[in-house]
C-alpha cells in the first residue's frame, strides 16, 4: 500500500513565511515528508493555465511524486437544472487531470435523491463518458446526507458500471457512520483510492478523533491494497501532524520494516 498526501494538508505550511508555491509542492513532499504521491485539491490550481499544469506534472515526475488524483472541492449535483453544469465541470476536471498526468478525478455529490435515481445515475454516466477520451477514472467521494450513504453510493457505482467508475472512501466519513466496518465493506470493493482523514494528535501521540490503525485494518481486511492518502485540513502544526500520521500508518502497513528501522537506530 502506497502512502501519499493531499495538497490540502499543506495549505498552511510556510516556507520563509510564505505558503509553498504549487510548483514546489512535489519536491517538498518527496524530500521533506518522504512520501511519493499527491492528491491535488482543485483549489491549488486556481489561476493556473494549461502550461502551468504541465509544468507541475513535470516537476512531480522529476521528484518521483506523481499526481494520482485530482480532487474537486465543490459538491456537484447531477439532478435537474444543475446537471448540465456539473457535467461540464467534470469534463474540465478531466482535461486538467490529463495535463497533470493524474489517472483519476474525485468528486463529491451534492445530492443523491431517492426519486429519479436512474436518471441521476445516467447523468453521472454521461459525465464519465465526457472524460473517457482523457483515459481518466471518475471516483465518488462520500458527501453529506444521502450522498454519504455507503449503500446508496455503492448502488450508484454499480448502476453506472464499468472499470472507470469507482469510489474514494474517507476515514472521516467511515468514523462518522453508525457502523464504520459496514461503511468500509460497502465502498472499499469499488475504491481506487482511500483518504486517511487526519485530525489532531494528543500529547500521548494518540489520534484524537478516531483510531487510524483500526480503520486501516478494516480497509485492508476487504482486500484493498492501493493508495492511502493522508489528508489533514487543520492549521496547527501541519508538518508534524502529517509526519505523525505517516509514521503511524507506515508502521501498521509494514511492521517488519518498522522493526528493522528501530533495530538500526539501536545499533
Spans of features found by a protein language model:
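Catalytic domains of carbohydrate-active enzymes, especially glycoside hydrolases
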Residues: 21-43, 100-101
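Hydrophobic faces of well-ordered beta-strands that scaffold small-molecule active sites
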Residues: 1-8, 36-40, 67-72, 105-107, ...
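Short, acidic/polar
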Residues: 15-32, 82-95, 176-186, 212
